[in-house]
Amino acid sequence: MAKPFFILIPALGCDERLYASLMAAMADLVEPFVLVPDGDTLPRCVADVLEQAPQKFLIGGTSFGGHVAREVALAAPDRVLGLMVIGAGAGAASNPAGGVKRSERLRGGDHQGLIRDMAETITSPASPEGATAKQTFIRMGLATNPETIARHNDALTIRPDRWGDLEAITCPSLLLWGKDDRYSPSLDGLRMSAAMPNARFVELEDVGHLPTLEAPEDTADAMRHWLMDILIRR
């Protein structure tokens, strides 16, 4: 049986480096590839993903990527074999004004300053890999076109509240959070798992918003266990 495709969508300002270790850890089970959608709203991002995706696939994402992945699962339930969400709660933006300001900074020439500001809180101070993860985030962010980041940030700022829609996601789902996530509280992941009929919640200690960089082995272990459960049932 051919290995299923697994689409991975990075967090805001991130690229394939976010998933380098994860892709290596899952290569014997799936065909992973990173996709950065083009769009300034979640529906446009979803349309871009579905246009490029195979007929059937697994999908996952971190933060911005997790929001897009969840929207894809809602938009095309017949095509999605499994969903992985990392650090992306189901609510609307808690501070839309802050989101608007972030896009203004990006479009106003403060790309570097914004990325460095985000880096200050994106990892856990308790993470052994936190300092390295922070520097990787900065390198990714500075290498990403600021307009691309701004468009994705626009999509996040106006995203809808999805708490009432989660029960419609029936595919096997992994909800993985860092306990020290300061962008998306881990309690949101636990609450999502209670609302989704086929979801498991995994919380990682001493990890912030970027588990794939801060705790690559623990993240890979959780992901492989989830994937093997899916593949056994195929």
Map each language-model feature to its residues.
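Conserved HGGG/HGGXW glycine-rich cap/lid loop of the alpha/beta-hydrolase fold
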Residues: M1-P43, D48, T62
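Gly/Ala-rich beta-loop-alpha elbow adjacent to hydrolase catalytic centers
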Residues: G61, G65, A69
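Flexible "cap/lid" loop of the alpha/beta hydrolase fold
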Residues: L74-A75, R79-I115
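Conserved alpha/beta-hydrolase catalytic His-Asp/Glu region
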Residues: S94-A97, Q112-E167
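Short beta-strand/loop motif that positions the catalytic acidic residue
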Residues: I169, L175-W177, D181
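Catalytic histidine neighborhood in serine/cysteine hydrolases
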Residues: S193-H209
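Catalytic histidine-centered segment of alpha/beta-hydrolase-like enzymes
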Residues: V207-A220
